[in-house]
């Protein structure tokens, strides 16, 4: 028996990440090869953006994806999020030249307050929300706070790109296959302060840390490389990472929806006080996922260096949050 289609809303749908994302969702890569989807695509009510969205929709139609049960174009979140089961909030205000961080936070607070309110009003009560648009953790916090009738746990931020970047760097250094690396995690904010933690990581049951055995490389090369990878891609490509961000969004949602089969993955989720992170802060944690629910991996020992890194990324997140509290 064929499954009933689920509704997937994507904001910023005509942008670079949207373009790298939509075809993969429609082909079944995110929710499974047996799950039909209806795409509810949101773009700003600007003629150029709406025309670009029309072009993307034409291409989606021209792929004749068997799982694509419908496509809708929207300029209002109140219609785009109607009954949606999954919402990928990709569209955000990018930082322009000479723009202060406070201005960026304020501009995004406006967007994510409106989107949170719309989700609260019209989305499915079980909607799974992934915020991709930066600053992702704080934007997820804003949307969550603007949707008091939805469970806070339904709002997540994307740290999977940092996680995947970290796995790739460790694989290259240690000569491992990237898919063999288990129990890697990234703590904190999706920003250069994130802390990619390899202390528990294994390949074939053996410690990655012991196999690499180079603490100076870990601190002086690995952590800055992962933290500044986005900037390095902009410098090289002249554009921000879009395909890798879309890929991470697919990974995050697929594992949340279909389960991580006991493996650790990194998700930015609202804290309940785990590891001393104040409740409500959207923070990168190691999680396992099953039956559409995530669970933070608890009880991991935190050494002095790790605590220092976690405190640093937490302080940055608290600063961002304090910067938007008056707007909520």
UniProtKB/Swiss-Prot annotation:
Belongs to the LDH/MDH superfamily. MDH type 2 family. The gene is mdh. Keywords: NAD, Oxidoreductase, Tricarboxylic acid cycle. This is Malate dehydrogenase. Catalyzes the reversible oxidation of malate to oxaloacetate. It comes from the Bacteria. One of its GO terms (biological process) is tricarboxylic acid cycle. The active site is at residue 190. Substrate binds at residues 95, 101, 134, 165. It comes from Acidovorax sp. (strain JS42). NAD(+) binds at residues 12-18, 108, 115, 132-134. It catalyses: (S)-malate + NAD(+) = oxaloacetate + NADH + H(+). Its EC number is 1.1.1.37. SUPFAM superfamilies: LDH C-terminal domain-like, NAD(P)-binding Rossmann-fold domains. GO terms for molecular function: L-malate dehydrogenase (NAD+) activity.
């Amino acid at each position: 028996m064929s499954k009933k289609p689920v509704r997937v809303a994507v904001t910023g749908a005509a942008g670079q990440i949207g373009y790298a994302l939509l075809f993969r969702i429609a082909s079944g890569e995110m929710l499974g090869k047996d799950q039909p989807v209806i795409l509810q695509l949101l773009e700003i009510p600007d003629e150029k953006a709406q025309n670009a969205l029309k072009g993307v929709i034409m291409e989606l139609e021209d792929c004749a994806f068997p799982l694509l049960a419908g496509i809708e174009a929207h300029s209002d979140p109140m219609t785009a999020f109607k009954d949606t089961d999954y919402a990928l909030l990709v569209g955000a205000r990018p930082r322009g030249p000479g723009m202060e961080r406070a201005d960026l936070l304020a501009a995004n607070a406006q967007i994510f307050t409106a989107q949170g309110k719309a989700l609260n009003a019209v989305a499915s009560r079980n909607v799974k929300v992934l915020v991709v648009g930066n600053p992702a953790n704080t934007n997820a916090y804003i949307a969550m706070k603007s949707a008091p009738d939805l469970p806070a746990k339904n709002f997540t931020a994307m740290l999977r790109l940092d996680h995947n970047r970290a796995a790739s760097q460790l694989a290259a250094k240690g000569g491992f296959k990237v898919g063999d690396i288990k129990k890697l995690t990234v703590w904190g904010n999706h920003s250069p302060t994130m802390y990619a933690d390899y202390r528990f990581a294994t390949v074939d049951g053996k410690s990655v840390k012991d196999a690499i055995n180079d603490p100076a490389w870990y601190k002086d090369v690995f952590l800055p490389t992962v933290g500044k990878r986005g900037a390095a891609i902009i410098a090289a490509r002249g554009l921000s990472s879009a395909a890798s961000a879309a890929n991470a969004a697919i990974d995050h949602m697929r594992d949340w929806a279909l389960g991580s089969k006991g493996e650790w993955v990194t998700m930015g989720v609202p804290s309940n006080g785990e590891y001393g992170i104040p409740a409500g802060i959207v923070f990168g944690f190691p999680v396992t996922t099953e039956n559409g629910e995530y669970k933070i991996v608890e009880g991991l020992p935190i050494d002095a260096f790790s605590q220092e890194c976690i405190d640093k990324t937490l302080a940055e997140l608290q600063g961002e949050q304090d910067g938007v509290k008056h707007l909520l």
